[in-house]
Regions:
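A metal-dependent, Asp-based hydrolase signature
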Residues: 64-141
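Non-catalytic pre-domain segments flanking phosphatase-related domains
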Residues: 1-21, 63, 67-70, 87, ...
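Short acidic-hydrophobic, aromatic-tinged amphipathic segments that line or gate anion-handling sites
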Residues: 175, 251-259
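Acidic, Mg2+-coordinating phosphoryl-transfer loop and its flanking beta/alpha structural elements
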Residues: 150, 206-252
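Conserved Lys-Pro-Asp/Glu-containing loop-to-beta segment of HAD-superfamily phosphomonoesterases
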Residues: 184-214
């Protein structure tokens, strides 16, 4: 087992009142490998235009915007795909249609995982980021209010949170993507949290593996903890994730939550 904390900027605040968690890749591994569904599908759409571009170049472009928009609602990545198609002279397609097809393909990858959790063949621990469930409980017991915000559709987040066993741990609520909203849901959650809870930004700590929540938290003056879990092995650091999180402005990088005491000590909780 590998565990190390990389502190880029020491926390110097008076203590945390609220914690925001991302879901996929931060708490849940149900959707592990979603990029392996989205990126090839998006590349397939662009290649079908017959522009005779280099396939590696297309893959590089798609990977860049998929990574950059990780953490926002899925529809934003689909909007970026539509823009890439239109730039090449292709027809505009409702990004919602791209999203439907992506989710259909993703479901074939993750259906057995959800079924396994539903019928008890798999334990929630099998598909939770190491130590994450216990860590949330410890924060709650320390009097820190916990919120969950995800770019995944809200109905799916709530259901998958119940499968992992964390649905009832978020006294600040579970917030996911809604079809009617095209604003960044995580930005709204963070700003509402600061306003409604009357927080100084330094009283907010965010845990996430996406560019968006880390960048938003850092810009607003909260403390951003990048969770660079190697989702395939469940242990150690994913260097690509780490690089993305560092670029977003992470104050600290952890591989998972297994060593709760070490994380609490590093955060002065």
């Amino acid at each position: 087992m590998s565990f190390s904390i990389e502190t880029i900027k020491e926390y110097g605040g008076r203590g945390f009142k609220c914690a925001l968690f991302d879901f996929d890749g931060t708490i849940s591994l149900i959707r592990e490998g979603w990029q392996k569904v989205m990126i090839p599908y998006f590349c397939e759409v662009i290649e079908a235009l017959g522009t005779n571009e280099n396939k590696d170049g297309i893959c590089e472009e798609v990977t860049e915007f998929v990574d950059r928009l990780t953490g926002k609602q899925t529809i934003f990545q689909c909007i970026a795909l539509d823009e890439a198609v239109v730039r090449r002279g292709g027809e505009h397609v409702d990004p919602g249609e791209y999203k439907k097809e992506y989710l259909r393909r993703l479901e074939t990858r993750i259906a057995d995982r959800k079924k396994g959790l539903e019928i008890g063949c798999l334990s929630p621990d099998d598909l939770a980021v190491r130590g994450s469930v216990e860590f949330i409980k410890v924060l709650r017991n320390a009097g820190i209010r916990c919120f969950l915000a995800s770019g995944t559709d809200e109905e799916d987040v709530i259901y998958e949170a119940s499968l992992i066993g964390v649905k009832n741990l978020f006294d600040g609520g579970i917030h996911g993507a809604k079809d009617a909203l095209l604003d960044c849901s995580k930005e709204a959650v963070i700003k509402n949290m600061i306003e409604e809870q009357k927080l100084d930004p330094e009283e907010l700590v965010t845990f996430g593996d996406g560019f968006v929540e880390i960048e938003l938290t850092a810009k607003l003056g909260g403390y951003a903890v990048g969770v660079a879990t190697n989702e395939k092995t469940g242990d150690g650091i994913d260097e690509k994730k780490r690089a993305r999180l560092m670029l977003a402005g992470a104050d600290m990088i952890i591989p998972h939550f297994e060593d709760t005491e070490a994380i609490l000590k590093a955060l002065h909780i």
